[in-house]
């Protein structure tokens, strides 16, 4: 059987189940996807910092000040989530370099292209993730 990849617009590549799992081409695809995602987050973060610096003015109106503080708190929470996401992206990039990317940390089985396409930082297969979430619910209910 000959492996074929899905090729989209002019040179745009998309991994296919017909290829060997985590081939060099697939790894390069996911590496670039992760790097692009990280750059988008960093750009948004820089824009947030700039916006926060511009919004340091005092608002004489109490309602305006409260609204501004609420916006600032929301932006800071978003920035914290972005920082955590960058850490997960860096972990995924490290797994690519180590040859562990795309394989479930719990079972060692392939995570699957569809899941990685949707969530490139995934470390668990769908089944392992569901087991993990069930265990969390059981312990949370205790």
Across the structure, where does each feature detected by a protein language model lie?
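Cys/His-coordinated zinc-binding microdomains
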Residues: 34, 108, 129
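Interaction interfaces in information-processing and related assembly proteins
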Residues: 1-98, 135-136, 141-142
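Cysteine-rich micro-motifs
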Residues: 122-129
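Residues immediately within or flanking Cys/His clusters that coordinate Zn2+
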Residues: 83, 101, 122
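Short cysteine-rich clusters marking metal-coordination/redox-active sites
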Residues: 104-107, 125
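Short Cys/His-rich "knuckle" micro-motifs
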Residues: 114-118
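Short functional micro-motifs and their immediate structural scaffolds
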Residues: 111-112, 133
């Amino acid at each position: 059987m000959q492996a074929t990849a899905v090729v989209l617009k002019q040179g745009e590549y998309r991994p296919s189940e017909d290829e060997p799992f985590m081939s060099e081409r697939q790894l390069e695809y996911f590496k670039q996807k992760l790097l692009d995602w990280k750059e988008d987050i960093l750009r948004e973060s820089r824009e947030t910092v700039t916006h926060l610096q511009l919004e340091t003015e005092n608002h004489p109106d109490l309602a305006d000040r409260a609204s501004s503080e609420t916006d600032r708190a929301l932006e800071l929470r978003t920035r914290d989530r972005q920082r955590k996401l960058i850490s997960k992206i860096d972990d995924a990039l490290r797994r690519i370099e180590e040859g562990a990317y795309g394989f479930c940390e719990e079972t060692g089985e392939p995570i699957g292209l569809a899941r990685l396409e949707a969530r490139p930082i995934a470390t668990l297969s769908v089944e392992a993730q569901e087991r993990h979430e069930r265990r969390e619910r059981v312990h949370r209910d205790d």
